[in-house]
From Swiss-Prot:
Recorded catalytic activity of this chain's protein: Endonucleolytic cleavage of RNA, removing 5'-extranucleotides from tRNA precursor
Span list, region Disordered: 1-20
Cystine pairs: none
Gene that encodes it: rnpA
The organism's taxonomic lineage, starting at the top: Bacteria, Bacillati, Actinomycetota, Actinomycetes, Mycobacteriales
EC number: 3.1.26.5
Family membership: Belongs to the RnpA family.
UniProt keyword annotations, A-Z: Endonuclease, Hydrolase, Nuclease, RNA-binding, tRNA processing
Assigned GO CC terms: ribonuclease P complex
Subunit structure: Consists of a catalytic RNA component (M1 or rnpB) and a protein subunit.
MF terms in GO: 3'-tRNA processing endoribonuclease activity; ribonuclease P activity; tRNA binding
Protein name listed in UniProt: Ribonuclease P protein component
Enzyme class: hydrolase
Length: 119
């Protein structure tokens, strides 16, 4: 489970990250990253978007748990000012955690290359 300080909870944070952030698509997920300019941030924050297109409630919660686990694994690679939103695509319902983690790492690396960010 993601620690509370690393969870994105406000809709304004989600909206800003999705609309102003850099996007990278993978087969199972779309990742958005925005570098926050607030200096008092306790660390990177991660939010999930798992819509009904992914499946019924049981399938959506399963995907959410897997994505949270994958996000926890890459948390240490993120800058403290990073805001990351992970949008699950319908294919993610059949994905296993290692594949989701690899796709998340690949997407974040693509974003780093596009923005020229050091971490």
């Amino acid at each position: 489970m993601l620690p509370a300080q690393h969870r994105m909870t406000r809709s304004t944070e989600f909206g800003a990250t999705v609309s102003k952030g850099t996007r990278a698509a993978q087969p199972d997920v779309v990742v958005y990253r925005l570098r926050s300019d607030q200096t008092a941030d306790p660390g990177p924050r991660v939010g999930l978007i798992v819509s009904k297109a992914v499946g019924n409630a049981v399938q959506r919660h399963r995907v959410s748990r897997r994505l949270r686990h994958a996000a926890l694994a890459v948390l240490e690679d993120l800058d403290p000012s990073d805001r990351v939103v992970i949008r699950a695509l319908p294919r993610s319902r059949d994905a296993v955690t290692p594949r989701l983690e690899q796709e998340l790492r690949t997407a974040l690396e693509r974003i780093r290359q596009r923005t020229g960010a050091p971490s």
